[in-house]
């Protein structure tokens, strides 16, 4: 996988109450990922960019909600999230990332 693809796979961290709880209890982090990203690609991207060891990757597709607008019905974008379990003793500090 080339360097450019590594940066396109991970779109950014997903911050929510559930993600924070998982980070504290299960040593998991949650990322928003590209719609066409596969589990092995996501694992390689996280290991290369953050220099950590990944134990497992679970992916979920979330369909965008249908919303009513002034011009009729609209739809929010679909998103894909990856739940990444890190090896014990590993962590990702989002503040110190280059």
UniProtKB/Swiss-Prot annotation:
GO MF, any single term: rRNA binding
InterPro entries reported in the protein's UniProt record: Nucleotide-bd_a/b_plait_sf, Ribosomal_uL23-like, Ribosomal_uL23/eL15/eS24_sf, Ribosomal_uL23_CS
Biological processes per GO annotation: translation
Any Pfam family matching the protein: Ribosomal_L23
Any one Gene Ontology cellular component term annotated for this protein: ribonucleoprotein complex
UniProt keyword terms in alphabetical order: Ribonucleoprotein, Ribosomal protein, RNA-binding, rRNA-binding
Keyword S-adenosyl-L-methionine: no
Role played: One of the early assembly proteins it binds 23S rRNA. One of the proteins that surrounds the polypeptide exit tunnel on the outside of the ribosome. Forms the main docking site for trigger factor binding to the ribosome.
Family membership: Belongs to the universal ribosomal protein uL23 family.
Name this polypeptide is given: Large ribosomal subunit protein uL23
Organism: Hahella chejuensis (strain KCTC 2396)
């Amino acid at each position: 996988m080339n360097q450019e693809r590594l940066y396109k796979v991970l779109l950014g961290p997903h911050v929510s109450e559930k993600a924070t709880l998982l980070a504290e209890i299960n040593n998991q982090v949650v990322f928003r990922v590209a719609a066409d990203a596969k589990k092995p690609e996501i694992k390689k991207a996280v290991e290369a960019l953050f220099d950590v060891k990944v134990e497992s990757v679970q992916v979920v597709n979330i369909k965008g909600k249908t919303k009513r607008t002034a011009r009729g019905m609209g739809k929010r974008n679909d998103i894909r999230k990856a739940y990444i379990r890190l090896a014990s003793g590993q962590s990702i500090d989002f503040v110190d990332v280059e």
